[in-house]
C-alpha cells in the first residue's frame, strides 16, 4: 500500500547515498583532522567516521642544515609490510610509514620517539538526508547539492526494486551510470 511505500522513502535515500559514497572518489568528501602520535606507541586512533585514509603526516620544528623542517608525509603500506619492516614496536625512530590496522586505527612505523602533532586526510560520509531527529532533519548534504542527478537516479533504482519493477530498474541503472560517470570525470579533473 502507499503508506508502506512512503515509509520506505528514507531507506531508498539512505541506500542511494551509501551507493554513491562507495562509487564516487571525490576529494570534496575529504576531511582533515589533527591527530597526535604518542611517544612509544605505534597505534593512532582515527577520527569517527573515517572510511578511507588518504594521507597521514606529522609536523616537526627540527632544524636540519639550518632549515626548519615542517610537514612530513608518511607513506602508506600494508599492515603486514609495517610489522615486517618494524617488528619490534618497543624500538623507536622517526615515523616513515602508516598502515590501516583496523577500521578505527592506523599503525605507524617506526614507533615514534617523541609525541608529535599530525594530521590525517580521510574520506567521511556526509550526514545522511534520512537522518531525522525529533522535528529536525537534514534537508541538504553534499549529495543533494552536488550529485543530485545520481542521487535521484539511485533513489529511483531502490524504489523500483521495492515495487519489483525490474524492467524499469535497468533503465534507471543506465541513467545512474551516466550521471555517476559524469561525476567521476569531474572529480578526476579536480585532481589534475
Model-derived segments and spans:
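Glycine-enriched, solvent-exposed interface loops adjoining structured elements
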Residues: 1-192
Amino acid at each position: 500500500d502507499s503508506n508502506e511505500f512512503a515509509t520506505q522513502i528514507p531507506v531508498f535515500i539512505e541506500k542511494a547515498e551509501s551507493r554513491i559514497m562507495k562509487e564516487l572518489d571525490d576529494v570534496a568528501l575529504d576531511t582533515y583532522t589533527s591527530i597526535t602520535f604518542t611517544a612509544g606507541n605505534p597505534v593512532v586512533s582515527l577520527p569517527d567516521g573515517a572510511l578511507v585514509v588518504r594521507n597521514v603526516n606529522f609536523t616537526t620544528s627540527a632544524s636540519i642544515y639550518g632549515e626548519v623542517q615542517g610537514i612530513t608525509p608518511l607513506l602508506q603500506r600494508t599492515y603486514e609490510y609495517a610489522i615486517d619492516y618494524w617488528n619490534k614496536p618497543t624500538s623507536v625512530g622517526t615515523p616513515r610509514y602508516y598502515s590501516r590496522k583496523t577500521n578505527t586505527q592506523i599503525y605507524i612505523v617506526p614507533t615514534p620517539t617523541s609525541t608529535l602533532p599530525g594530521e590525517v586526510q580521510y574520506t567521511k560520509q556526509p550526514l545522511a538526508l534520512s537522518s531525522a531527529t525529533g522535528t529536525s532533519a537534514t534537508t541538504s548534504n553534499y549529495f543533494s547539492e552536488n550529485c543530485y542527478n545520481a542521487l535521484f537516479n539511485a533513489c529511483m533504482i531502490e524504489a523500483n526494486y521495492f515495487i519489483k519493477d525490474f524492467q524499469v530498474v535497468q533503465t534507471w541503472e543506465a541513467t545512474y551510470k551516466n550521471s555517476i560517470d559524469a561525476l567521476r570525470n569531474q572529480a578526476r579533473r579536480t585532481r589534475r
